[in-house]
């Protein structure tokens, strides 16, 4: 009974049986030094993971002052079991500027918190969500959504999301959002399509969005896919277009990957080369470390795991800022300690 009480991954029926046995033999268990407090038992149901990252970023833009950043970031991921189907998940972040030895916000910040339920092939997430567009490998959006998301399907998988995005794009404005994506895998080929609708007053005041500056919507269509030549080499591509914008309305990415570093596999490594074009009126918040919205050009990178749970990354971008047609480049380096 004591060993069973220490386990935190039992079903509801098994847990009820253990609780009845613990109540019946409480005196014997206490005499053996087994602690039967419900508070202590429930505390074991909260699991913590996280990482500590050091990032170096050197950003260059033609006719602008160079920018060099050194950032130390701690992130914690608590996961609490609610019952057999539901969990509560969250992420906490604290940043420190290595040049000034000061935190950017001065405190630990809650990035998101949500409840996630799983019922076979159905997954439901409610709350504030770390949200990405998946079909395009997060070329259009990698940020947060306050609302709900549902995933379901087997051969063809679907994702539907509805909610509100704060700090939409690179501005401190909000947007209402609805989106759907469909994807499937056929042997070595994976592909999908998506539609994403954004509504915000931000678009009316956005310079270079439309000719008349009257539209407050973005309707983004996308397609993406990947092909695995073997266990080491894969080619990925994606394309997206905003049907409402008149300018800078297209985004595309082609990437060739070789292997990849795994934090659990010491000595593993990987590399990639890519060309990306990220029009600012469609790639609102892209996921990349060395390319941002309104940039285009080549990117290369490599990852390596020198020790278990310690990974390193180096990336370089050379290209242009699209709107002003000026040269741009960025160097990015990272060391991550996962726990």
What are these regions (language model features)?
Residues 8-9, 16, 20, 36, ...:
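Outer-membrane beta-barrel pore domains
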Residues 43-60, 64-197, 226-229, 251-285:
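Outer membrane beta-barrel
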